[in-house]
């Protein structure tokens, strides 16, 4: 029983993550960028974005694919690039947030570590940054400017104005 509908060979490339953006589009995160595919029955490669820096983090949702690199800058050691799901660059931003987790959630980019959170919009503009009492386990957007902050000692709902 062969259930393979499509296959591609990429010599010298590692693809650690594949995600479905919707029923018709998917993306493969590569060690040198990402490749976009279209088609629900037989996915076809439509766009490949290559980068010449080492990718340290990735994030995505239905509308954005993000890559983070180290850039060697002492003041702002990370560069974030956000791409639309058609492969066009939406923004590039240098930042210095000491994050351990980055993800896209509800049209925002959420960065956090055990005690700090940062919320950016889909263009990389910071909407909020702060510290919390307790150890952060998870941070999720739940509604219009509402976020769920899961801590080791409980759960908080945060509303940004």
Identify the residue ranges that each predicted region occupies.
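Surface-exposed loop/turn elements that mediate protein-protein interactions on large endomembrane-trafficking
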Residues: 1-11, 30-50, 75-95, 115-132, ...
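Short beta-strand elements that form the blades of beta-propeller/WD-repeat-like
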Residues: 17-30, 34-36, 60-75, 101-119, ...
């Amino acid at each position: 029983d062969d259930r393979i509908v499509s296959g591609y060979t990429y010599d010298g490339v590692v693809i650690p993550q594949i995600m479905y953006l919707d029923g018709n589009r998917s993306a493969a995160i590569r060690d040198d960028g990402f490749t976009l595919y279209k088609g629900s029955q037989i996915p076809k490669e439509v766009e490949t974005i290559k980068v010449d820096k080492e990718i340290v983090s990735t994030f995505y949702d239905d509308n954005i694919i993000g890559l983070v690199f180290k850039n060697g800058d002492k003041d702002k050691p990370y560069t974030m690039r956000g791409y639309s799901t058609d492969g066009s660059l939406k923004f590039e931003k240098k930042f210095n947030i000491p994050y351990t987790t980055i993800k896209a959630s509800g049209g925002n980019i959420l960065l956090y570590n055990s005690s700090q959170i940062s919320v950016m919009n889909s263009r990389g503009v910071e909407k909020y940054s702060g510290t919390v009492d307790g150890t952060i386990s998870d941070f999720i957007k739940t509604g219009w400017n509402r976020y769920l902050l899961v801590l080791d000692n409980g759960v908080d709902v945060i509303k940004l104005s």
